[in-house]
A protein has these predicted regions:
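Non-catalytic cap/lid and distal C-terminal segments of serine-dependent acyl enzymes
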Residues: 1-118
Length: 118
């Protein structure tokens, strides 16, 4: 989820659809207190407020998570940032699922089936 989201948000002109499944979007917790521009510009929760590329508002964004996902709070925060920016997205919260392959195997085909081609 993180890498898909970070790439899509940094390069929205190349991405039409973003499916993030169980993503964490703030890398600061992995940096042991270190912070510089590289950390900032690789933490979507930080840099999204400053972006104004119109393609962000054209992207189809899905944040897939579950109520037992270790990244559940991160997805709620990302949804809030996107909502604050009026960027349309779908926060898909599955019930009673963990941060693991079985739920992602459910999510991915469902998300693919929702893509509208032409």
């Amino acid at each position: 989820g993180y890498h898909a989201a970070n790439f899509a948000f940094r390069h929205p002109g190349y991405v039409s659809h973003l499916f993030s499944m169980g993503g964490a979007f703030d890398i600061k917790s992995f940096m042991d207190g270190f912070h510089n521009d590289d950390v900032f510009y690789n933490s979507p929760l930080d840099y999204l407020y400053g972006l104004d590329d119109y393609e962000l508002w054209n992207m189809d964004i899905v944040l897939g998570t579950s109520n037992w996902d270790i990244c559940f709070d991160a997805n709620l925060k990302m949804s809030k940032v996107l909502s604050d920016r009026n960027i349309h997205h779908w926060l898909d919260i599955r019930q009673d699922k963990k941060h693991d392959w079985p739920v992602w195997k459910e999510m991915f085909p469902h998300y693919l089936s929702r893509i509208k081609f032409f």
